[in-house]
């Protein structure tokens, strides 16, 4: 009996151990499921990861491959996505040079049957501009294009298109071979606009320095410029570099505003627009003084241009930048209005170049003031060789 009882006790103990083992396996499996293990055939003892066993280098390689594929896909999307102002350079035929500028060359050409001017800009050509400076200039160019391509007005140069690259652009070589062409650097950009055969207003005025302009022509040019600026301001655009050099004439002497290199959408907060932007002699006092400014800086510059159109002369030809800056801001220096200038026109000049921006008229008001001027009785300056000693004539000071 004792032997039989002992065997039964031993069997019960084995059964209990077996049950305990099964329960442990059940708990372990439940924990494995709860942890969401992805190790597959790994045993329970290997559920804990050891940092010294992890191959971080392999992870880096895989991550780099993944990012490279993602970047390549993104670049493919970007390369196929074109801005609405981008043009097909294959349709552009460049003929010859029109002018040289600070950062590039202007060519005459043909785009899809239209007579055009092509401005090719290469900011790294001099080897001085750093990569950061070149990037900033390219961004500025893109801003110019973004402003220009939306404009449509008879007194604003018509924008045709632009390209942030010039890899497909062929420029005739200076060599004698008619088949020889040059390709600008890939970093270069180009903008294409309508070709205006009359050249710049600046050159037109220089050609008329001695004989001057008829009063009717003075008012016509002034109205063209004022209407163009009024349109820009209605679109919340401040040109910021209004000068006769940035105005072009077509075959019928209609004036059109050009060069939006420093134009920008007007900030709602004037303090967001600061810094010296413009050209010596045309810059408003608040701009010269580094103060916040708005569209009224264009009104000031227009006043200087109006004087220049009437006189066919240039303001402050004998003063340095520092002298002009100081005198305009602190001494209220302005060009001297000839005594023979009609009071109606002289009044517009003075209103436009008032030291207080808030007192300057809006450009649409300037348009109305100019339209009200009677040109039937003359009023322009007499040619210099016909001067009879009138105090309104001064010796020519050159272009």
Where do the language-model regions lie?
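Conserved catalytic-loop aspartate of Hanks-type protein kinases
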Residues: 298
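Protein kinase glycine-rich loop
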Residues: 95-106
